[in-house]
């Protein structure tokens, strides 16, 4: 049959085939009924309130001490567990705690007897360490380990600790008064010194402040110069950058315009090509057809005109021949007339010349006075003497006509007056 236990207890199996007994702390074990026996022992931690009443210390002063200890049976160490089983197997936790408490109290009393009240009161850590050390070495033989020990309380019935406190309090108060007086004295000295140091520090501080102000103003002036220089450089750089940016923008704009212009040119070229094709489809081909038609019409008209011209030329030729025949007949008649005039001239000579001159004289007079007939307006300017108005014009015309014989004589060499006064001669 299997038996189990928790980590806070141990099982001890003894009997048939179990020599020495088997000890299991926190686990399971197989037990043969009737021929084997199983017992349990607690491994719980036990809290002990260790009181030592009216124990005389090294100087014979009785005091009472209370300590708190934590102890337990050690289950991890087989030897300590075996010792605990030999001593406490079958006992309850209360019985085990009582045994451990009696042991600890004895060791606590022993340590108190070897120490003074002042040592126990002032150095509790030392007292606790000594009790823990002595009790642990004794309880380990029982299989019990001391987990911790602390001194909880110290008191006495003789007011020793209170008197010790009074003396200490009086000493402390005395030291406090002395310290207070010395402190006041030192405080006055320190106050005066502090005032002196304060004034000196104030002067030094003002000097340092003046130096700092001077250094600040110098550094600030240098900083302002540097800042203004950097700001001017930054402004100039900004303006340069703005100018460069504007230039780049302008270049980009020009490039865009060039591209747009190129695109427009390409579009225009495409439009021109399209219009040329459209023109060729709408105008050129019909024009070529019209031209061919006109050429054909012109050729037909040309042939017609040639035929008309040939007919007119034939008509003109025949008319010319007729006119030539008429002119020839007229010329023959005029020649006969001229021959007769020549015969008459030969017969009458000067009389014939005079007759010819007189016959042509009106024509000559007409040609001489021709410019006057084309004048639309005549303006007469008088010098204040002589005739005026139409009489003046008539006189001028008569004067021109009176000079006609002279003109004829200069042109022909024949004097009308001489011919007129000579007697007519015949051949």
Curated annotation (Swiss-Prot):
GO terms for molecular function: protease binding. It is found in: Cell membrane; Endosome; Membrane, Caveola; Melanosome. It is a peripheral membrane protein. May act as a scaffolding protein within caveolar membranes, functionally participating in formation of caveolae or caveolae-like vesicles. CDD domains: SPFH_flotillin (cd03399). It comes from the Eukaryota. Belongs to the band 7/mec-2 family. Flotillin subfamily. Heterooligomeric complex of flotillin-1 and flotillin-2 and caveolin-1 and caveolin-2. Interacts with ECPAS. InterPro entries: Band_7 (IPR001107), Band_7/SPFH_dom_sf (IPR036013), Flotillin_C (IPR031905), Flotillin_fam (IPR027705). Keywords: Cell membrane, Endosome, Membrane, Phosphoprotein. The modification Phosphoserine is found at residues 19, 163, 385. Disulfide bonds: none annotated. This is Flotillin-1. It comes from Sus scrofa. One of its GO terms (cellular component) is melanosome. GO terms for biological process: axonogenesis; cellular response to exogenous dsRNA; dsRNA transport; extracellular matrix disassembly; intracellular signal transduction; plasma membrane raft assembly; positive regulation of canonical NF-kappaB signal transduction; positive regulation of cell junction assembly. The modification Phosphothreonine is found at residue 387. Pfam families: Band_7, Flot. SMART domains: PHB. The lineage of its organism: Eukaryota, Metazoa, Chordata, Craniata, Vertebrata.
């Amino acid at each position: 049959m299997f038996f189990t236990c928790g980590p806070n207890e141990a099982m001890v199996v003894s009997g048939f085939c179990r020599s020495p007994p088997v000890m299991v702390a926190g686990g399971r074990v197989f037990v043969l009924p009737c021929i084997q026996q199983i017992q349990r022992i607690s491994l719980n931690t036990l809290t002990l309130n260790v009181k030592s009443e009216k124990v005389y210390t090294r100087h014979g002063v009785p005091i009472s001490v209370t300590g708190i200890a934590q102890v337990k049976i050690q289950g991890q160490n087989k030897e300590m567990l075996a010792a605990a089983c030999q001593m406490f197997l079958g006992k309850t936790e209360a019985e085990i705690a009582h045994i451990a408490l009696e042991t600890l109290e004895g060791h606590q009393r022993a340590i108190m007897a070897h120490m003074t009240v002042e040592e126990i009161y002032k150095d509790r850590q030392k007292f606790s360490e000594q009790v823990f050390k002595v009790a642990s070495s004794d309880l380990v033989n029982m299989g019990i380990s001391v987990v911790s020990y602390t001194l909880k309380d110290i008191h006495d019935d003789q007011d020793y600790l209170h008197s010790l406190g009074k003396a200490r309090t009086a000493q402390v108060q005395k030291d406090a008064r002395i310290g207070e007086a010395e402190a006041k004295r030192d405080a006055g000295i320190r106050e005066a010194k502090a005032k002196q140091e304060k004034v000196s520090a104030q002067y030094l501080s003002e000097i340092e402040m003046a130096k700092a102000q001077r250094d600040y103003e110098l550094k600030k002036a240098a900083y302002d110069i540097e800042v203004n220089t950097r700001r001017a450089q930054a402004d100039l750089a900004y303006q340069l950058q703005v100018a460069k940016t504007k230039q780049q923008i302008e270049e980009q704009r020009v490039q865009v315009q060039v591209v747009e212009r190129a695109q427009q040119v390409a579009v225009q070229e495409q439009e021109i090509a399209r219009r040329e094709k459209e023109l060729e489809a709408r105008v050129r081909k019909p024009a070529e057809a019209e031209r061919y038609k006109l050429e054909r019409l012109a050729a037909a008209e040309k042939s017609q005109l040639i035929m008309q011209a040939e007919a007119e030329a034939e008509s003109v030729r025949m008319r010319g021949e007729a006119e030539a025949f008429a002119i020839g007949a007229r010329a023959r008649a005029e020649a006969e007339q001229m021959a007769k005039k020549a015969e008459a001239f030969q017969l009458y000579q000067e009389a014939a010349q005079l007759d010819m001159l007189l016959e042509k004289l009106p024509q000559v007079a007409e040609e001489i006075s021709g410019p006057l007939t084309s004048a639309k307006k005549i303006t007469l300017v008088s010098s204040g003497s002589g005739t005026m108005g139409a009489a003046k014009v008539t006189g001028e015309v008569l004067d021109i006509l009176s000079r006609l014989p002279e003109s004829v004589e200069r042109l022909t060499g024949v004097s009308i007056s001489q011919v007129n006064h000579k007697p007519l001669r015949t051949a």
